From Swiss-Prot:
<dbReference type="InterPro" id="IPR005630">
    <property type="entry name" value="Terpene_synthase_metal-bd"/>
</dbReference>
<dbReference type="InterPro" id="IPR050148">
    <property type="entry name" value="Terpene_synthase-like"/>
</dbReference>
<feature type="short sequence motif" description="DDXXD motif">
    <location>
        <begin position="381"/>
        <end position="385"/>
    </location>
</feature>
<keyword id="KW-0150">Chloroplast</keyword>
<dbReference type="InterPro" id="IPR008930">
    <property type="entry name" value="Terpenoid_cyclase/PrenylTrfase"/>
</dbReference>
<keyword id="KW-0464">Manganese</keyword>
<dbReference type="GO" id="GO:0000287">
    <property type="term" value="F:magnesium ion binding"/>
</dbReference>
<dbReference type="InterPro" id="IPR036965">
    <property type="entry name" value="Terpene_synth_N_sf"/>
</dbReference>
<dbReference type="InterPro" id="IPR001906">
    <property type="entry name" value="Terpene_synth_N"/>
</dbReference>
<keyword id="KW-0479">Metal-binding</keyword>
<dbReference type="InterPro" id="IPR044814">
    <property type="entry name" value="Terpene_cyclase_plant_C1"/>
</dbReference>
<dbReference type="Pfam" id="PF03936">
    <property type="entry name" value="Terpene_synth_C"/>
</dbReference>
<dbReference type="InterPro" id="IPR008949">
    <property type="entry name" value="Isoprenoid_synthase_dom_sf"/>
</dbReference>
<feature type="binding site">
    <location>
        <position position="385"/>
    </location>
    <ligand>
        <name>Mg(2+) 1</name>
    </ligand>
</feature>
<dbReference type="GO" id="GO:0010333">
    <property type="term" value="F:terpene synthase activity"/>
</dbReference>
<keyword id="KW-0456">Lyase</keyword>
<dbReference type="InterPro" id="IPR034741">
    <property type="entry name" value="Terpene_cyclase-like_1_C"/>
</dbReference>
Length: 630
């Protein structure tokens, strides 16, 4: 079972871009500044560097977060250009796609006519792994399934060797096969890894600087990421292999192998994203010391053609990203949202996330919808947590419940633009969703947003009253206020897979998947944001509430507990993604799962949205703004 759905060959899909451009409306009017923050002398010092107070034009003293402004000027975004949308690049890519298919088809078969069976299993696994990490697997779904069916036909409880006639299984082939087969929905047990442990449960590897030995442990480490709950051997494999690799990388010269180890140790699996991995692997695969390019051509494999195709596909998609980003930036300008100077404007960063996880050209509606929705969520978060008054928040909630453009007239001036932006974004996404779902999903989505805003309101009440809830009370509300459901629901409905209500409930509220993903997002966010949130007057976090329930615990104790919860959730999410009896299309499961990976990556070092000037800025450049050299 493939993790990525099939897609038509065309990489440009200009029709959506053209249609969305026509939907852009001119700025409705000059936007008044009533309710905006007066920058400058109206700021008054506060007790924290993370919180500032400002006097708004209506005379109220309001709390605002001390966030940096938008990093990506619209003029800069509109000036972006690339030649990779030209037909000649697409034509060359199509030719290479055909040649790579021939590589798959010429692999050794059971009759042994194509090649000796000494390496027929590991070569298939290497090809599948390579096209996936290079970001070109969508073109080879049939070939990948055929290759993995072949490998699986020789799989047994003791693992596999390099070839079908191998007398003994080996760690490298077995770990690679286990990881790839499990990710594609084949039934494989982690018990197979116990074959390579001694009687004390230790993996029998001596320290080595040989590339073959180190790469074997690297593949064991990669396999350990795809753990399900209760798989102790996977935990043991991760502990052993991570320690081994950290020691080994210090002893080998800088090379494609050291670069690959550093990246894998840094990002693992659940803090990674498909396009980010592709961008890194292009450097690894094309490194002068790469063993794959050293081989260059074998009887059926041409690594240079794989690399050329991957670079072309990366850059062709890059041309589509530019068009979508230019549309999104115009939407942001025309929406009036830039006038809300107290808010975090991170539409470019959210688009980067969406295009790093939804890498098929045909999923433009998902990418743009996710970016819009997340940006609206962030601005509303700044209103509900800091800038807005309780009376204003209740007015906004009522306007969303009534769901009529005329409701904006009852709102404060600064809320009118965000209300209309939300109204128009959800309405537009519902139209896109109707094309694939065959029904109007707007009311369903709107109800989800009502619940979401109610959870925000609860947090605002806690802030206003200084109330610190119990951990259970906090987490129950936080599963909704994390925003995962609001961010994911409507974009998922735009995917090209039917999600009738009975199926949708298996991935949306009240499903186990939604519960886990929402809990994960809030808990991971808390571990990175709780100190800054506390400085802004937001006392309630999973850390503080857990400490309240358990007097005598330190912050470090609470953090350790929350991180342990996160690790358990990741394993349960792996199961929800890959369990064999799910009736939810893999495309929908995969995109919902990728959203958790994306947010995990952004929260890896810090709150990468509030502070988007460091790793997040680099992510935008490497995966969206810059093509790779051909």
């Amino acid at each position: 079972m493939a993790l990525v759905s099939s897609a038509p060959k065309s990489c440009l899909h200009k029709s959506l871009i053209r249609s969305t451009h026509h939907e852009l409306k001119p700025l409705r009017r000059t936007i008044p500044t009533l309710g905006m923050c007066r920058r400058g002398k109206s700021f008054t010092p506060s007790v924290s560097m993370s919180l500032t107070t400002a006097v708004s034009d209506d005379g109220l003293q309001r709390r605002i977060g001390d966030y940096h402004s938008n990093l990506w000027d619209d003029d800069f975004i509109q000036s972006l250009s690339t030649p990779y949308g030209e037909p000649s690049y697409r034509e060359r890519a199509e030719k290479l796609i055909g040649e790579v298919k021939e590589m798959f088809n010429s692999m050794p078969s059971e009759d042994g006519e194509s090649m000796s069976p000494l390496n027929d299993l590991i070569e298939r696994l290497w090809m599948v792994d390579s096209v996936e990490r290079l970001g070109i697997d969508r073109h080879f779904k049939k070939e990948i399934k055929s290759a993995l069916d072949y490998v699986y036909s020789y799989w047994n409880e003791k693992g596999i060797g390099c070839g079908r006639d191998s007398v003994f299984p080996d760690v490298n082939s077995t770990a690679s096969g286990f990881r790839t087969l499990r990710l594609h929905g084949y039934s494989v047990s982690s018990e197979v890894l116990k074959v390579f442990q001694d009687q004390n449960g230790q993996f029998a590897f001596s320290p080595s600087t040989k590339e073959r030995d180190i790469r074997t442990v690297l593949n064991l480490y990669r396999a350990s990421f795809i753990a399900f709950p209760g798989e102790k051997v996977m935990e043991e494999a991760e502990i052993f292999s991570s320690r081994y690799l950290k020691e080994a990388v210090q002893k080998i010269p800088v090379s494609s192998l050291s670069q690959e180890i550093d990246y894998t140790l840094e990002y693992g699996w659940h803090t990674n994203m498909p396009r980010l991995e592709t961008r890194n692997y292009l450097d690894v695969f094309g490194h002068p010391t790469s063993p794959w390019l050293k081989k260059k051509r074998t009887q059926y494999l041409d690594s240079e053609k794989l690399l050329e195709l991957a670079k072309l596909e990366f850059n062709i998609f890059h041309s589509l990203q530019q068009k979508e980003l230019q549309y999104l930036s115009r939407w942001w300008i025309h929406s009036g949202l830039p006038e809300l100077t107290f808010g975090r404007h991170r539409h470019v960063e959210y688009y980067t996330l969406s295009s790093c996880i939804a890498t098929e050209p045909k999923h433009s509606a998902f990418r743009l919808g996710f970016a819009k929705t997340c940006h609206l969520i962030t601005v509303l978060d700044d209103i509900y947590d800091t800038f807005g008054t309780m009376d204003e928040i209740e007015l906004f909630n009522e306007a969303v419940r009534r769901w009529n453009p005329s409701e904006k007239e009852r709102l404060p001036e600064y809320m009118k633009e965000i209300y209309m932006a939300l109204y128009e974004a959800l309405t537009d996404m519902a139209r896109e969703a109707e094309k694939t779902q065959g029904r109007d999903t707007l009311n369903y989505a709107r109800k989800a947003w009502e619940v979401y805003l109610d959870s925000y309101t609860q947090e605002a009440k806690w802030i206003a009253s200084g109330y610190l809830p119990t951990f259970e009370e906090y987490l129950e509300n936080a599963k909704v206020s994390s925003g995962h459901r609001a961010a994911a629901l409507t974009p998922l409905l735009t995917l090209d897979v039917p999600l009738p209500d009975d199926v949708l409930k298996g991935i949306d509220f009240p499903s186990r998947f939604n519960d886990l993903a929402s809990s994960f997002l809030r808990l991971r966010g808390d571990t990175r944001c709780y100190k800054a949130d506390r400085d802004r007057g937001e006392e309630a976090s999973s850390i503080s509430c857990y400490m309240k329930d358990n007097p005598g615990l330190t912050e470090e104790d609470a953090l350790n507990h929350i991180n342990a919860m996160i690790n358990d959730i990741i394993k349960e999410l792996n199961w929800e993604l890959l369990k064999p009896d799910s009736n939810i299309p893999m495309t929908a499961r995969k995109h919902a799962y990728e959203i958790t990976r994306a947010f995990h990556q952004l929260y890896k070092y810090r709150d990468g949205f509030s502070v988007a000037t460091q790793e997040t800025k680099s992510l935008v450049r490497r995966t969206v703004l810059e093509p790779v050299p051909l």
